[in-house]
Amino acid sequence: MFKTVFAADIGSKCIKCVARGQVAAEETAIALEAGAKLTVAAAGNAALLHRSGVIRPVRDGAAANTRMLALLLGRLACEKTGKRTTASIELHAAIPHMLPTVKQNALKQAARLAGFRALQVHDPLLMGAIGADADLFSDRAHMIVNIGAETMTCAAFANGGMLWQGFSNEGSAAVDRAIQNWFRDEHRLLIGERMAEIIKQNLNKLSFDIEGRSADDGLPQTVRANGAELRAAAQKGQTALIRFVKDAVKALQPEAAADLLDTGITLIGGGALQFGLAECFSRELPEIPILTAKNAVTAVADGMN
C-alpha cells in the first residue's frame, strides 16, 4: 500500500519541502486572516504578500510558536501533497540532534499538533551529506558545514559513520546584523532585516541606493553606499562563522584533519551562498579546499527525497 510522505527541512527563514518527488523552498512564514486567531490566510512564500499579520514561528532553529508552526506545516503539507487533511500524511522532519532537548521537543510537538499520521526524525547533517553527494563510506574524512540563518551545524564523516559534530547559534544573520550596524554607525541610517538581507545577496555590486530611516530625525532617507565598504562590513559578520569552522577542524583527530587537505569542506544551507563567504573560508584555511554544494539550499531536502 502506498503512503503519502511530506518531508521538511525546517529553517528559521526558509523551509525546504519534499512531496511527490519534488523539492521546493518556501519562506518559514504564515499569515492569518484578519480578526481570526487560527484561520490561515496563506503560508510559505504566499504569506509575504500580506503586509500585516505575518508570523515567523521559528527562531534560532527552534519553534518559537509551536501552534503557528503546526499550522504552517499542515498547510504546506496539504498544498504540496494534494491532500485535504494531514491525517493520512507521514511527516519526515530534519531536526538537529545537537539542539537542546527542549527545542527538539518543541519541533516534535508542532508536528503532533499538525495532526500528521506519523513522524520520522532525521539528522539534517547526514541528510545534507547524502544530498550533496558526499562519499560517506570513504575511509578518508570529509566535513560538511550547514549554514542556516540563525544556526550552524558541522560534522565530519568517514567509513559510513559520523566522527564529530558541532552546533553554533551563529548563522548568516550575523552578517545581516553587521550590515545594519555599519549603516547605523557610518550613515546614521536605520534599516530592517529584510533590507539587510537584500544587500547581503547583492554584495557584488559597485554601489547601492539604500532606503531607510534617519537615526537623527526619524524621517525616511536614501543613502548611496560603496560596495567595497559593505563587503568589508559583511566580512566582520562572517568572523563568527569562520571561527566555528576553524574550531571544528581543530577538534578532529590528527589523521581526520589531515584528510581534509584532500577531501575538503563542503558548505550547504542557504547561508553558504553568501557572496564572498567561500573565499573568506579559503583565506583562513588556505590548505583546505572549500566547496559549495551545487544544491546548497536544498541539500538536506534532497537527501530526504
Residue ranges and their predicted role:
Residues M1-I144, F157-I265, A272-K294, T298-V300, ...:
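Nucleotide/phosphate-binding catalytic cleft detector across ATP-hydrolyzing
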Residues T153:
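Positively charged, low-complexity, intrinsically disordered RNA-binding extensions
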